[in-house]
UniProtKB/Swiss-Prot annotation:
Name used for this protein in its record: Glucose-6-phosphate isomerase
Source organism (scientific name): Mus musculus (Mouse)
Assigned protein family: Belongs to the GPI family.
Function noted in UniProt: In the cytoplasm, catalyzes the conversion of glucose-6-phosphate to fructose-6-phosphate, the second step in glycolysis, and the reverse reaction during gluconeogenesis. Besides it's role as a glycolytic enzyme, also acts as a secreted cytokine: acts as an angiogenic factor (AMF) that stimulates endothelial cell motility. Acts as a neurotrophic factor, neuroleukin, for spinal and sensory neurons. It is secreted by lectin-stimulated T-cells and induces immunoglobulin secretion.
Enzyme Commission designation: 5.3.1.9
UniProtKB keywords: Acetylation, Cytokine, Cytoplasm, Gluconeogenesis, Glycolysis, Growth factor, Isomerase, Phosphoprotein, Secreted, Ubl conjugation
Major localisation: cytoplasm
Record: active site: 358 (proton donor), 389, 519
Entry-linked HAMAP family: G6P_isomerase (MF_00473)
UniProt PTM comment: ISGylated.
CDD domains assigned: SIS_PGI_1 (cd05015), SIS_PGI_2 (cd05016)
GO molecular function: carbohydrate derivative binding; cytokine activity; glucose-6-phosphate isomerase activity; growth factor activity; monosaccharide binding; ubiquitin protein ligase binding
InterPro entries: G6P_Isomerase, G6P_Isomerase_C, Phosphoglucose_isomerase_CS, SIS_dom_sf, SIS_PGI_1, SIS_PGI_2
Length: 558
């Protein structure tokens, strides 16, 4: 595929942007079109609640949206989408299919890889997860002293950690009757030491999540957990009752002491950051119950079908992707904020920080050439209203344009004080997107200062600081309630958004070679940290850092 910058549709879009973008004033666009909200929003009825995607507060008009959709068609988005769903090996650097959609394929229609339907295997693992969850949650699964399991500790990193952590936090209200769940990812010993300190070996079950069962951080933490466990249990055969594996490497799992019967497999067509739908989601199913895990899968499947079958101009993941292309490749925006107004979604932005940045943080195209345009944005965010008192200042009055997605449920899980808290939360959510769109004109600020009784001199000094330019773009994503089904749909919506942008940029969204170099060098450096002899094999900075660490290692502090 030709580079994006040489695509005639993109050149047309860029020309239009250069000539007309200065005239896209959101206040004026809303005043000129009373139907703007209806024309630039989607109301998705999932039959398990609604998801409203309001993109009317973006710097677009019908002409821009039409050009963006034409651009998507010219970049082959529809064919690429169909290739993914049909099991083609679209992860071309690793020669793999990309089939997280098969993991949640509730219709059970065949999906083939190399001519073989993967659905029987997917369903076999789901059935195994279901019976395991029932045994643990009912108390039938006993530890080495005959006690039931009260705590699940998921040991993994990256995709084996961020997804299950985000989802178990988001679905806490659905965890009644389930074991508590803990996540250990960091190689920093503090993480596992602090976690184990509050647990009892007799009632703890460890999930070791590693596809290869060789991930350094995960296996080091797993060995530490096993040591801690055996200090109490004494008998190595007890490991089988307290450790299960999510892996594809039976030999390594067995060597660790885990019964292969307690190994839940997944496949090379499941990427780590798209794996919470697979056996990697075992901690989710244990915590909230398998029925709720199935609802999560069903919500994602609903969004998969919407993405697969809906024309591009009414397709939520596609529209979100195209708006991102508009801001990144025409306006030069470098970041994207995800701002969920729901405390249960407090890890949502962190999850999609990996989802987006590990997928589209690439500068090499399918042909092996370097791109001559921007690709994936820096993704970040915090829950509202906390963010309002932290970084929104820069979004409102800073020098950078930061497109934002605001997300909120209409119904709260905790309608305390007759819904007062949630009413205030909703009011803040609505106020922020309106404020970012409208801003505050000098004459509006002047009236406020006069009403506050400011002297003419003070008024003139303060006035420039009280003006808001506005015209800051946002999407509002409003859903009935944060249920397992709706959460599944929201996650899938963003997954497909990321996929569409990768196709537009002609990069592989499903490998992550950028993770490898640091890991290779760390293996080389680790033995050099032994002893006290000087190291000279690196650049002067790295050598100097190693020397400082060696000097300070045994320093006694008062």
């Amino acid at each position: 595929m030709a580079a994006l910058t040489r695509n005639p549709q993109f050149q047309k879009l860029l020309e239009w942007h250069r000539a007309n973008s200065a005239n896209l004033k959101l206040r004026e666009l809303f005043e000129a079109d009373p139907e703007r909200f209806n024309n630039f929003s989607l109301n998705l009825n999932t039959n398990h609640g609604h998801i409203l995607v309001d993109y009317s507060k973006n710097l677009v008009n019908k002409e821009v949206m039409q050009m963006l959709v034409e651009l998507a068609k010219s970049r082959g988005v529809e064919a690429a989408r169909d290739n993914m769903f049909s099991g083609s090996k679209i992860n071309y650097t690793e020669n793999r299919a990309v089939l997280h959609v098969a993991l949640r394929n509730r219709s059970n229609t065949p999906i083939k890889v190399d001519g073989k339907d993967v659905m029987p295997e997917v369903n076999r693992v789901l059935d195994k997860m279901k019976s395991f969850c029932q045994r643990v949650r009912s108390g039938d699964w006993k530890g080495y002293t005959g006690k039931s399991i009260t705590d699940i500790i998921n040991i993994g990193i990256g995709g084996s950690d961020l997804g299950p952590l985000m989802v178990t936090e988001a679905l806490k209200p659905y965890s009644k009757g389930g074991p508590r769940v803990w996540f250990v990812s960091n190689i920093d010993g503090t993480h596992i030491a602090k976690t184990l300190a509050s647990l009892s070996p007799e009632t703890s079950l460890f999930i070791i999540a590693s596809k290869t069962f060789t991930t350094q951080e995960t296996i080091t933490n797993a060995e530490t957990a096993k040591e801690w466990f055996l200090e109490a249990a004494k008998d190595p055969s007890a490991v089988a009752k307290h450790f299960v594996a999510l892996s594809t490497n039976t030999a390594k799992v067995k060597e660790f002491g885990i019964d292969p019967q307690n190994m839940f497999e997944f496949w090379d067509w499941v990427g780590g950051r798209y794996s919470l739908w697979s056996a990697i989601g075992l901690s989710i199913a244990l915590h909230v119950g398998f029925d709720h895990f199935e609802q999560l899968l069903s919500g994602a499947h609903w969004m998969d079908q919407h993405f697969l079958k809906t024309p591009l101009e009414k397709n939520a993941p596609v529209l979100l992707a195209l708006l991102g292309i508009w801001y990144i490749n025409c306006y030069g925006c470098e970041t994207h904020a995800l701002l969920p107004y729901d405390q249960y979604m407090h890890r949502f932005a962190a999850y999609f920080q990996q989802g987006d940045m590990e997928s589209n943080g690439k500068y090499i195209t399918k042909s092996g050439a370097r791109v001559d345009h921007q690709t994936g944005p820096i993704v970040w965010g915090e829950p509202g209203t906390n963010g309002q008192h932290a970084f929104y200042q820069l979004i409102h009055q800073g020098t950078k344009m930061i497109p934002c997605d605001f997300l909120i449920p209409v119904q709260t899980q905790h309608p305390i004080r007759k819904g007062l808290h949630h009413k205030i939360l909703l009011a803040n959510f609505l106020a922020q997107t309106e404020a970012l769109m409208k801003g505050k004109l000098p004459e509006e600020a002047r009236k406020e200062l006069q009403a506050a009784g400011k002297s003419p001199e003070d008024l003139e000094k303060l006035l420039p600081h009280k003006v808001f330019e506005g015209n800051r773009p946002t999407n509002s994503i409003v859903f009935t309630k944060l249920t397992p089904f709706i959460l599944g749909a929201l996650i899938a919506m963003y997954e497909h958004k990321i996929f569409v942008q990768g196709i537009m940029w002609d990069i592989n969204s499903f490998d992550q070679w950028g993770v490898e170099l640091g890991k290779q060098l760390a293996k080389k450096i680790e033995p050099e940290l032994e002893g006290s002899s000087a190291v000279t094999s690196h650049d002067s900075s790295t050598n100097g850092l190693i020397s400082f660490i060696k000097q300070q290692r045994d320093t006694k502090l008062e």
